[in-house]
Amino acid sequence: MCWRPSLTKGFYVKSYYKVLSSPGGGLFPWKSIWKVKFPPRVAFFSWTAALGKILTADNLRRRGLILVSWCCPCKADGESMDHLLLHCAYAKELWDMIFVWFGISWVMPRRVLELFDCWQWNMGCHQKLVVWRVIPHCIMWCLWRERNARTFEGCELNIVELKLQFYRYLFDWRSATGLFSFSNLLDLIDYCSI
């Protein structure tokens, strides 16, 4: 959930109550998913995740499949979509890396849909904003691919390798748009740092 000020009054309890009492918490944040420039299959994955439809263990159990429900990356009990992509200790390492990189404090929302709704924060600088908007998609894509590699191929990246994979995807996706003149990954990291 993201509580935004009204245009005239700022933050008021009444506006917060309206956000809390509205069913679904508001409109679907489709611009956070479909208006950001990155590979279409990643956009489809993000859209599916925002709708709560990716095939994690809890969703497969709801469909009648009997399987062990544990999170591959953190080896904890109960693989849900929100746990895997937001709250898993393995995912937390990636999210914390981003928040330190951009020099911000952040409280992770409960659900993926709420994250996309809150992620529309304005960074001020256009190039930083373009990078900022693709980050949740990139992190979730890395985590999903790692989960699938562990589940179906028996391969496992350590957290440092996963962080490097994240940066590689981020740099490649941003370079493919032609919006940036960064010659290497270190230039991108340095530019977005606080």
Model-assigned labels for residue ranges:
Residues M1-I194:
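Charged boundary/loop elements
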